[in-house]
A protein has these predicted regions:
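Short, flexible turn/loop "capping" segments at secondary-structure junctions
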Residues: 24-26
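Pre-Walker A adenine-sensing motif
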Residues: 16-22
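Non-catalytic interfacial helical region
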Residues: 2-16, 28-31, 38-42, 47-127
Length: 129
């Protein structure tokens, strides 16, 4: 159900391992959640967001991006410090890398390689890329 990328290393977690990681707050900096079951993807997205930015989902520390977006928006969102909190999350829905040029793709991938400890990136897809 989920692929986590931690500083260039990847591991695939099933629901039990993901649930354990969330409970123990051992969440990777970059998380790719995918699946055909919309309910499960949403449930685990909500649990990751609860663990990183809290249940109130303060918009200051939750940055939402969808589809295509200015690459600078992603890099700035990842690099900026959380406000009035210890952590923040960047939620990317329906990322379509084919809509970006080569420089944009390279910038996105480089940004995901070096996510600061106070930031969690969650990439959502209803299908596995």
């Amino acid at each position: 159900m989920q692929l986590q990328i931690e500083r260039g290393n990847s591991m695939k977690l099933d629901e039990d391992k993901l649930s354990t990681a969330i409970k123990s707050r051992e969440i990777s900096r970059v998380n790719y959640l995918y699946g055909e079951e919309r309910f499960l993807v949403k449930t685990y997205t909500d649990r990751l967001l609860d663990a990183t930015v809290g249940k109130d989902r303060n918009d200051i520390n939750l940055i939402k991006l969808a589809g295509t977006f200015p690459v600078d928006t992603l890099t700035d969102s990842i690099d900026s410090m959380p406000l009035f909190a210890d952590s923040k999350a960047v939620l990317i829905s329906d990322l379509d890398l084919e809509k970006f040029d080569d420089n944009g793709i390279e910038t996105i991938l480089n940004s995901l390689k070096d996510v600061p400890d106070e930031c969690t990136v969650i990439i959502l897809s209803l299908i596995h890329i």
